[in-house]
């Protein structure tokens, strides 16, 4: 069974919209009333490139999420979302958050990720 993860902290006004399960990856979409979106995705393994295309990014910064190193991709245009990508070795999972939000906010969202084993079918 695939482990489920969820965001426990969201910026004000954001709420969960939908979940999309693909063969080995999961995409969760959160949005606010003005149409801004946070996309949280994760998959088993360490191939983060399949979650995230780092094409139109001007700058990559190393940041910390707790004790895990992550890459923050600063979008080159205001209209493009920023991205945060990291791999958890112990979970053998990689994670990605993309949102048109400031770096500090996206990191705070990432720090609130919780494993959710209470999956009710």
How should these model regions be labeled?
Residues 90-121:
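Surface-exposed amphipathic alpha-helical segments
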Residues 1-90:
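Short, solvent-exposed recognition patches
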